[in-house]
Amino acid sequence: MPKEKYEPPDPRRMYTIMSSEEAANGKKSHWAELEISGKVRSLSSSLWSLTHLTALHLSDNSLSCIPSDIAKLHNLVYLDLSHNQIQSLPAELGNMVSLRELHLNYNQLRVLPFELGKLFQLQTLSLKGNPLTQDILNLCLEPDGTRRLLNYLLDNLSVSTEQPPPRSWIMLQEPDRTRPTALFSVMCYNVLCDKYATRQLYGYCPSWALNWDYRKKAIIQEILSCNADIISLQEVETEQYYSFFLVELKERGYNGFFSPKSRARTMSEQERKHVDGCAIFFKTEKFTLVQKHTVEFNQLAMANSEGSEAMLNRVMTKDNIGVAVLLELRKELIEMSSGKPHLGTEKQLILVANAHMHWDPEYSDVKLVQTMMFLSEVKNIIDKASRSLKSSVLGECGTIPLVLCADLNSLPDSGVVEYLSTGGVETNHKDFKELRYNESLTNFSCNGKNGMTNGRITHGFKLKSAYENGLMPYTNYTFDFKGIIDYIFYSKPQLNTLAILGPLDHHWLVENNISGCPHPLIPSDHFSLFAQLELLLPFLPQVNGIHLPGRR
């Protein structure tokens, strides 16, 4: 950060005075810079209404203080307050996070507010000729002095923000009381791997709040507070899975399965510890593990390239993975849901899948192909399990239900989400970027090889998102990007969503000027998803032509 190239104002400022004739003819003035000079002692309050300004030149005046209202000029990228008599700066100056240059030379500043450390996009901070303390001046003289000083200020800024209010629990529908059901809850959470939590990416967060030892406490607290029956995590570091997450969650009755990204297989044991991957945990009192699977997208791309250069050069080079566990519901879960003894003899299985797709917005084609690969493999897993375990597990719906959790790195209007939620996508969808994938994509049709119909690749699931209709305005919240990229999908008609955990209070974020996460009070750049699902169970055999749903 910052990612956009900054063009400083032209020092040769040109002034054009509009003639009365131009004004009479309706000519509009467009100006984004303002200079005020002439030994001005105070500033008019009307100045703070000029929120369109990007540069403000206030040097060579007689200003002794700057009002806190200056923070209303939120579009400023350049502010020059040099050669004044300013003795102190308002803390609110730290909220002007668009600033790239701040010139404070030759004033009477003895201290700087720690809030200045929040100006993470600042490239130049000029402080010559001020009676500042020696440690501040020494920091300024070091290589990359501005960055070092800002880091020092931010790391020493006390956190006065109160904890966010609890996220609301949103009921969507009542459980089906007319038939046997099993209720269980699912969490999906990208925990932000330590190696990605850098000041370069998250310059607005103090270094101590990016530290994994600090963040992991809040992460595990959030996970445990939800008390989900199934937990799907992305960006879990290999070493942290075994030494932290598995240890903490096993103590609370969970078992888990984890796979690192494909690059781990070529690394030394020491390097492998820091590779992130996907994990699924489940409560052993409610589920029994039947099978576990890892899906490596680069291996699938290599095996199914069919001569496609895009498949080899774009998809195969990305090492994202997915994992899946086939779980059997324990009798106790069914009895807890129904409040009655479970008298059925059939096994009830469910497949839980978790994936993390490639991140780069320029690779929408890769995300879409990875999603197709994953769903194809999930379908294969379900089909094989159904055949090997025979009809005793299928019930009246004819297939094993699916819960799919993922950081898809794709917005709701993307080809990825269209593919999942509508059952298919056109082979000429814009997200393929007109690259040649057609021959290889037929291999991933969930309707079997050559399963394309009318130029559309389809899959055999009926998937629905637990968070529909804008229930969450964003699941990823950084300074540069705010949007929905995390999802919980489930298969219909066997599964329904009864309730979900709502979004973090938007007013809390705005009122506390939180421009991005992580934050000292929010440990990841993602917000967790949490849903209560209802699984419709097969009716017990008929007695005199009447179904007995769990003998209720």
UniProtKB/Swiss-Prot annotation:
Residues given in the record as Mg(2+) 2 binding sites: 407
GO biological process per UniProt: miRNA-mediated gene silencing by mRNA destabilization; nuclear-transcribed mRNA catabolic process, no-go decay; nuclear-transcribed mRNA poly(A) tail shortening; regulation of translation
Ranges occupied by LRR repeats: 52-73, 75-96, 98-120, 121-143
Enzyme class: hydrolase
Annotated Gene3D superfamilies: Endonuclease/exonuclease/phosphatase, Ribonuclease Inhibitor
Classification via Pfam families: Exo_endo_phos, LRR_8
Cofactor(s) in the UniProt record: Mg(2+)
Taxonomic superkingdom: Eukaryota
Region (Nuclease domain): 153-552
Entry GO terms, CC: CCR4-NOT complex; cytoplasm; nucleus
Keyword Membrane part of the UniProt annotation: no
Keyword vocabulary terms for this entry: Activator, Cytoplasm, Exonuclease, Hydrolase, Leucine-rich repeat, Magnesium, Metal-binding, Nuclease, Nucleus, Repeat, RNA-binding, RNA-mediated gene silencing, Transcription, Transcription regulation, Translation regulation
Name this polypeptide is given: CCR4-NOT transcription complex subunit 6
Organism this protein belongs to: Xenopus laevis
Enzyme Commission code: 3.1.13.4
Catalytic activity: Exonucleolytic cleavage of poly(A) to 5'-AMP
Cofactor note: Binds 2 magnesium ions, but the ions interact each with only 1 or 2 residues.
UniProt-listed InterPro entries: CCR4/nocturin_mRNA_transcr, Endo/exonu/phosph_ase_sf, Endo/exonuclease/phosphatase, Leu-rich_rpt, Leu-rich_rpt_typical-subtyp, LRR_dom_sf
Function as written in the Swiss-Prot or TrEMBL entry: Poly(A) nuclease involved in mRNA decay. Has 3'-5' RNase activity. The CCR4-NOT complex functions as a general transcription regulation complex. Enhances ligand-dependent transcriptional activity of nuclear hormone receptors.
GO molecular function, one term: metal ion binding
Chief location of this protein within or outside the cell: cytoplasm
Protein family per UniProt: Belongs to the CCR4/nocturin family.
PROSITE patterns: LRR
